[in-house]
Amino acid sequence: MQSRIDKLCEKMHDNEAVFISSYPNIFYYSGFTSEDAYLLISHSGKYIITDSRYTIQAREQAKGFEVIDIAKGFEKIFSRIDEKYIGFEESYMSVAENKRIRAKLKDGQDFVEMQNLINKPREIKDECEIKKIAEAEKIGDMAFEYILGRIKEGVTEREIAFDLEFFMKKQGATALSFDTISASGIRSAMPHGIATDKKIENGDFLTLDFGCVFEGYCSDMTRTVVVGKANDKQKEIYNTVLKAQTTAIDAIKAGMKCSEVDGVARKIITDAGYGENFGHSLGHSVGIEIHENPSFSPKNNAVVQNGNVITVEPGIYIDGFGGVRIEDLIVVQNGKAVNLTSSPKELIEI
């Protein structure tokens, strides 16, 4: 954790400190696993502010941080540091909380927005983070192999989702990355079709988008299968998405613009006549949170870097017919994409 703090402090001016209120950044910089805390990081000291329920836990997890009981020491916490500008995370703090924290500043100090500075180091995953994400993705791969044996005509979307989630937790997942997407038939045209009591029917597409959390880090993958035999149009759509996905993964190189990676997949889908049916970005970074930066989007000119962990998930969605999405999770290492997802991608007919 100290190396992460050192990198953060290198980006801060001598008269700047940061006050962190979001769980993802509290966990990233301290290792503390409760949401009931704040961090104050300056050039001269590190403080974790929490209540009496968590002070022992904070001492055990947040090594190198001075633990401050929120009931006793919070009122004068900013008097412990000399920095003038205290950075906060705009997206994670309500107006009311911001006002309450500002009232605790000492004379001459100012509360300023520094969310990008605080978040930026998380874009490049270290070896320990990559291992945890890879383990979470491995659990997802095992879950997909398991669920293939449970999918059949007459089973509901919700039953499939529940089975997936229960299996992942049995394998060591501590939570889900997000609500499992289980969408069949014409509902598969909804990119975020949350599971319902709809029964799976013969001839349906079934799209499953799921992930789990392992030691604080998320996984994410999507597979689309056909229940029964695929018709010609289903095969055409599926193979178009598969070509777009595999070609984009092969094209990823450190130094490329994220928009260029998106463009590789988008061109294939557009050339096949389905450009208007691919409405979302190609992918997003994954880490402590399921959606992080950078993303593979048409408008993102950020550069791909070694250590980025990003999804590649093109899709085609046709209202009234159904949809296909195929998603892998990749890490950029030695200048190219390394796939963390091992589940098969050829069209599966069940």
Where are these regions (language model features)?
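Active-site neighborhoods and metal-handling regions in enzymes and metal-associated proteins
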Residues: M1-I350
